[in-house]
């Protein structure tokens, strides 16, 4: 009888919903923590990878440009390394914004792969950093006794500080159609930040004065840091 009463009062783990729920919550918390840690590590590794590749390619591009001008090999390499690292990190951050947006994850993955391939091949740095850095190097030609302000200006990537969210939202948006998706040479127009062609039906942002067009995530992320056009450097 005593044994029967003991068995009837015994509650195995499988029949205790509260204990099972507690264990499941612990498992979910562990999975969430592990996922967050792995995501942080992966983001840090990718950021370091983009910065490293951008630095190396930027230094190479800057050295070649500096060698062809009076600025010098070392100064050109230094400017190119810094510009390449900054630009590569901004491209990576724009990629993350697109990944977290409502766009197709498969399309974002293809875009990220294309960016990585372009970065490794040097196309991103050569096409976007090269012209801006060449202008910075040439502006310093003949400067022997440069002041601290002059040295700071050569590494500056924008003419003014970033814009607030309200000011960025006021910049006009346009929809890509068959009439505005070609440049002056007849080629498909593209975003100079991510280097991807504009697609019909896409909504892009057209900057005032210069009217250069960019994807919304790309240019918004830029304008929060710089108050100028990333192509022509004209202040907004």
Curated annotation (Swiss-Prot):
Regions that span the bilayer: 45-65, 79-99, 105-125
Gene Ontology cellular component terms for the protein in this record: chloroplast thylakoid membrane
Topology relative to the membrane: Multi-pass membrane protein
GO molecular function: zinc ion binding
InterPro entries, sorted: Gly-zipper_YMGG, Znf_RING, Znf_RING/FYVE/PHD
Claim: Secreted is one of the keywords in the record: no
Main location: plastid
Pfam families on file: Gly-zipper_YMGG (PF13441), zf-RING_2 (PF13639)
Membrane-side (Stromal) residue stretches: 66-78, 126-236
Keywords: Chloroplast, Membrane, Metal-binding, Plastid, Thylakoid, Transmembrane, Transmembrane helix, Zinc, Zinc-finger
Membrane topology (Lumenal, thylakoid): 1-44, 100-104
UniProt keyword annotation of Transmembrane helix present: yes
Zinc finger (RING-type): 191-233
Subcellular location: Plastid, Chloroplast thylakoid membrane
Function of the protein: Intrinsic thylakoid membrane protein that fixes RPOT2 on the stromal side of the thylakoid membrane.
UniProt similarity note: Belongs to the RING-type zinc finger family. NIP subfamily.
Self-association and partners: Interacts with RPOT2.
Protein known as: NEP1-interacting protein 1
Organism of provenance: Arabidopsis thaliana (Mouse-ear cress)
Gene for this chain: NIP1
């Amino acid at each position: 009888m005593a044994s029967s009463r003991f068995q009837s009062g015994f509650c195995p783990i499988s029949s205790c919903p509260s204990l099972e729920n507690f264990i499941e919550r612990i498992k979910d918390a562990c999975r969430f923590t592990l996922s967050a840690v792995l995501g942080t590590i992966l983001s840090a590794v990718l950021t370091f990878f983009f910065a490293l590749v951008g630095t190396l390619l930027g230094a190479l591009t800057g050295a070649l440009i500096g060698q062809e001008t009076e600025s010098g090999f070392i100064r050109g390499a230094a400017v190119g390394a810094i510009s390449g690292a900054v630009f590569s990190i901004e491209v990576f951050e724009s990629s993350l914004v697109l990944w977290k947006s409502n766009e197709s994850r498969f399309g974002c993955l293809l875009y990220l792969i294309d960016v990585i391939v372009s970065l490794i091949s040097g196309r991103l740095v050569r096409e976007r950093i090269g012209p801006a850095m060449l202008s910075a190097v040439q502006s310093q030609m003949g400067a022997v006794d440069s002041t601290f302000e002059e040295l700071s200006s050569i590494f500056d990537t924008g003419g003014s500080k970033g814009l607030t969210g309200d000011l960025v939202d006021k910049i006009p948006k346009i929809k890509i159609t068959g009439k505005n998706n070609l440049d002056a040479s007849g080629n498909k127009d593209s975003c100079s930040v991510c280097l991807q062609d504009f697609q019909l039906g896409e909504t892009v942002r057209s900057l005032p004065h210069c009217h250069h067009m960019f994807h919304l995530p790309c240019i918004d992320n830029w304008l929060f840091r710089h108050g100028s056009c990333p192509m022509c450097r004209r202040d907004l």
